[in-house]
A protein has these predicted regions:
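TPR/TPR-like (Sel1-like) alpha-helical repeat modules
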Residues: 83-87, 112-135
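Amphipathic alpha-helical segments of tetratricopeptide repeats
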Residues: 2-7, 44-49, 86-91, 128-129
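Conserved alpha-helical positions within TPR/SEL1-like repeat arrays
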Residues: 14-29, 56-71, 98-109
């Protein structure tokens, strides 16, 4: 299926970032950690070329890599991934909108899992604030 998408798209098409991230998650679920890492890195390469519009996708990929490294027994690489993700979440380049809130909420639990409780709280509060300002109930 990836070959079909490759034939129908230009190299570097932003959709490959999401496709490669999803392929990485599939390989990760199958226990194929090296293949998963390769696809996360392919996704990262595409998204890096699309900065700054892809910053949140890059942050999520760093968080995904941290989870992968835990499963693969590569704990020494986890903190570096999470620190890069935090840097992006705190960046002034990222609009504080609904998509930001969604990604904050999506990643907050993972930060908590790794003991980054202040970051978990920071991301959760940021998401709640955005949802409240939009008239939504936080935590949904």
């Amino acid at each position: 299926p990836c070959r079909i998408v490759e034939q129908a798209s230009e190299p570097g098409d932003y959709r490959f970032g999401g496709l490669f991230n999803n392929m990485a998650l599939a390989w990760e679920d199958l226990g194929e950690y090296r293949k998963a890492e390769a696809y996360y890195k392919k996704a990262m390469d595409i998204m890096e070329a699309l900065r700054p519009g892809s910053l949140l996708e890059i942050a999520v990929t760093w968080v995904n890599l941290a989870v992968l490294y835990e499963k693969a027994g590569r704990e020494e690489e986890i903190d570096g991934c999470l620190e890069k993700a935090v840097e992006i979440f705190r960046s002034g380049e990222v609009p504080r909108d609904g998509y930001y809130a969604f990604n904050c909420r999506k990643c907050a639990e993972t930060f908590g899992h790794f003991g980054y409780f202040r970051i978990k709280k920071e991301l959760t509060e940021a998401a709640d604030r955005i949802y409240r300002e939009a008239g939504e109930e936080p935590g949904r």
